[in-house]
Amino acid sequence: MAANLIEDNCINLVKMKFVNNTLYFKAESDEGLESDYFGKLEPKLSIIRNLNDQVLFVNEGNQPVFEDMPDSDCTDNAPHTIFIIYMYKDSLTRGLAVTISVKYKTMSTLSCKNKTISFQKMSPPDSINDEGNDIIFFQRSVPGHDDKIQFESSLYKGHFLACKKENDLFKLILKDKDENGDKSIMFTVQNKS
């Protein structure tokens, strides 16, 4: 039994050129080519916890910290604990592209600009025409852990959202993944209906 050929999904190249140690190709036709971009899809309302079961909470200073909190307190503090995770269609296949926002008085979106984690007063845009952006993270399952998630920065490859204890606070930070099984970069995401 012969396999059926799938629709021709190839690009015919007609020219190659080296410029500053980068090889460029010229396609016979631009038809069907897309630019790299992220396009916003439907959001999910979620509670994010670290592996110590502490809840991600946006404090009055608009800073993301983890706190011990029973489920009833999560409901009572919903504007600070319920995150709006917008999923984005990604023109490349690198994981589920997401933004993480919270709406308390105004909409704020998580940013890792200059490798510093903060909430910026902004709504996530409908589309982002970049390959990497400070507000886009790739949400991925953790191999060997069915219910664990990690968030990799699209702007800083190999850098992940993580929980770190500083003084008496557990803060959300961006860190370079330094070892296999690093539990500080693992989270559980509980979607609300």
Curated annotation (Swiss-Prot):
Residues 1-36 form a propeptide. One of its GO terms (molecular function) is cytokine activity. The keyword Cytoplasm applies. It is found in: Cytoplasm, Cytosol; Secreted. Gene3D superfamilies: 2.80.10.50. Its main location: cytoplasm. Forms a ternary complex with ligand-binding receptor subunit IL18R1 and signaling receptor subunit IL18RAP at the plasma membrane. Mature IL18 first binds to IL18R1 forming a low affinity binary complex, which then interacts with IL18RAP to form a high affinity ternary complex that signals inside the cell. Interacts with cargo receptor TMED10; the interaction mediates the translocation from the cytoplasm into the ERGIC (endoplasmic reticulum-Golgi intermediate compartment) and thereby secretion. This is Interleukin-18. It comes from Canis lupus familiaris.
